Amino acid sequence: AQHYADLGLNNQLRNPVSNLLENRNDKWSIRTMSNAYFEVKPIKGLTLRTSVNFTTNAAKQDYYQSAFLLGKSYTGNKSTPDLTSIDGYRLSGFGYNAYWSTTATYDVTFNEKHHLNTMIGYDFEYNSDFEVQQDDRTDSDNPIAYNNTSITNVNGAKLWTGSSEYSNYVFDAMFARLVYDYNYKYVLSGSVRRDRSSKFGPDKRAGWFYSGSLAWNITEEDFMKDIHWLDIAKLRASYGITGNDQIGNDYAWISTISSDQNVVFGTTAIPTYYPSGYSNRQLGWEKNKQMDLGFDIGVFNALNIVVDLYKRTSDIVMPANIPNFNGIAGSVYMNAGQIENKGIEIQVSATPFKGDFSWETTLSWSKNNNK
């Protein structure tokens, strides 16, 4: 009779009972989140606020697949194991994230027509993760099922293997923002910030980023007061540069080493290593530049049109292969790529019916050129 763990007639799917009985994949995780803040208003218009957030993550996984799932017969026992091709590992991990933010905001209106809102602040973030894994993909005794780690080499089996991984990330920023409007007609805003990230080389960890915008609310002008069918007419323009450090590698700027084939000296096999990634102290922030021009129009309290023209340019951090004529293989992370998007976006929304029964329709159209 066919073994119950063998593949079925179509040679693609095993008996689900064997998967349930002979496969173990236990997972456990816990996540905690805590936060606190303190806020005070010492004088009118001034708000001082500081906040702290702390998050922890812990996880554990036990995975085991017996030889039965490979169609092997069970003929061994704890003292004389002879199972082949078993697969198991135990994975444990822990990480935490700490975030602190402090801001001072001042909001004031003077002479009834001038409104000013300013803010300065500081952010700090620290993230740490640790992971350890123990593997056994050998001919040894079922390690997790028997909880027997004393058997290390049975029937030519490989030794137990293990690995660990640790990473940390530090970020801080100082920033300032100002928003001014005159009688709700003219709005001016600007911001500047200095960010630092441990993901970049020592020479480029700090980056300066800024933005500015202007808006003219035409319907607030005196010469527009008698045009009652026009709800809103506004012109907008903005330009800014933002930074991105989420590049998928906490240590992209550091040299890395990988293992290669063994080299035999006499009767001994010696493992060899080679540089697979090279240091780049000039690796810096991905910078995103964006310029927008737009206008908003609303009429008859029923129809609204929003039009935006934009141009966005993004720098990209990417690995660049080292030419083979250097005599070495590998890659180095560089600010080597760039993407440009420009186009137009139009949105039209209408509410032809209002009251007990209402009907709202929104249409959007866009065109984008990418290179």
Report residues per predicted region.
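Extracellular/periplasmic, surface-exposed regions of secreted and cell-surface proteins
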Residues: 2-65, 76-371
